[in-house]
């Protein structure tokens, strides 16, 4: 049975997941997820491959809707709004809840246009030069690219490209930034820079990060959710939440034996 210590004291809950079940066709991928995401904190999702971490992450900004066989039961609230209500526009959800993917994926455009493109699509009417600079500064990239804004985003190093993607997400003024293993394709120095950036960003944004790196989860997050997977009689695999608590508790004093085994490296 999952341990979900989701009482967040005075911290406001920005995303609330209630009794969520996720299906791909007839296949149950995630079962009975209850989870609160606190505002202006970093929440890490950890667990073995196939346990549904990225699936849940993509439920938050409705990217899974793009998969024809996807179906969700239960509710996910963004404040008081059910994100899966019929009157909710998925495009607006994705503006408010941004996404940074596993591998850097800059648009085939200039550094400047990588930032400006999404803002233009979303009807931004302000000073575009100021928005580009502000977004790049927030992503700790401005000083490195300010003299080459018209160069291709693809000309940057891998770590710079990932920070460009973070700046691109920031430019459309989201409240939440989802990160799906954002450092898995980066070298250790670039990884450290992104981790430092995550600490800075949580002052203004709520961040949810999926990571297979236990040390990274311990370093960057305030709360950690551990997911596991169990086999079915038909050969399938169902992901479920084992334990959710303050990161320090998950790593130093977990309540569930499976959590203790995973964070200590006994399985996974």
Curated annotation (Swiss-Prot):
Top-level taxon in the UniProt lineage: Bacteria
Residues holding ATP: 47-54
InterPro entries, sorted: AAA+_ATPase, ABC_transporter-like_ATP-bd, ABC_transporter-like_CS, P-loop_NTPase, PstB-like
UniProt cross-references to Gene3D superfamilies, sorted A to Z: P-loop containing nucleotide triphosphate hydrolases (3.40.50.300)
Function: Part of the ABC transporter complex PstSACB involved in phosphate import. Responsible for energy coupling to the transport system.
Family: Belongs to the ABC transporter superfamily. Phosphate importer (TC 3.A.1.7) family.
The protein's name: Phosphate import ATP-binding protein PstB 3
Source species taxonomy: Bacteria, Bacillati, Cyanobacteriota, Cyanophyceae, Nostocales
């Amino acid at each position: 049975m999952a341990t979900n210590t989701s009482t967040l004291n005075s911290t406001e809950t920005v995303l609330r997941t209630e009794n969520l079940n996720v299906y791909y066709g007839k296949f149950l991928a995630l079962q009975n997820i209850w989870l609160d995401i606190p505002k202006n904190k970093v929440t890490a999702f950890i667990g073995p491959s196939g346990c549904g971490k990225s699936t849940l992450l993509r439920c938050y900004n409705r990217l899974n809707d793009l998969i024809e066989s996807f179906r969700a039961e239960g509710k996910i609230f963004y404040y008081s709004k059910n994100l899966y209500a019929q009157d909710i526009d998925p495009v607006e959800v994705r503006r408010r809840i941004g996404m940074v993917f596993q591998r850097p994926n800059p648009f085939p455009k200039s550094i400047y246009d990588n930032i400006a493109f999404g803002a233009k699509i979303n009807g931004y009417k302000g000073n575009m030069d100021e928005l580009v600079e502000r977004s790049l500064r927030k992503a700790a990239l401005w000083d490195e690219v300010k003299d080459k804004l018209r160069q291709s985003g693809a000309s940057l190093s891998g770590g710079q490209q990932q920070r460009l993607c973070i700046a691109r997400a920031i430019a459309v003024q989201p409240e939440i930034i989802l990160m799906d293993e954002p450092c898995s394709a980066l070298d250790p120095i670039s990884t450290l820079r992104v981790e430092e950036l995550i600490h800075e960003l949580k002052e203004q944004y709520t961040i949810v990060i999926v990571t297979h790196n236990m040390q990274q989860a311990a370093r960057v997050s305030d709360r950690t959710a551990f997911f596991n997977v169990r086999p079915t009689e038909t050969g399938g695999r169902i992901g479920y939440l084992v334990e959710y608590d303050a990161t320090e508790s998950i790593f130093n004093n977990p309540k569930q034996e499976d959590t203790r085994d995973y964070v200590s490296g006994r399985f996974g």
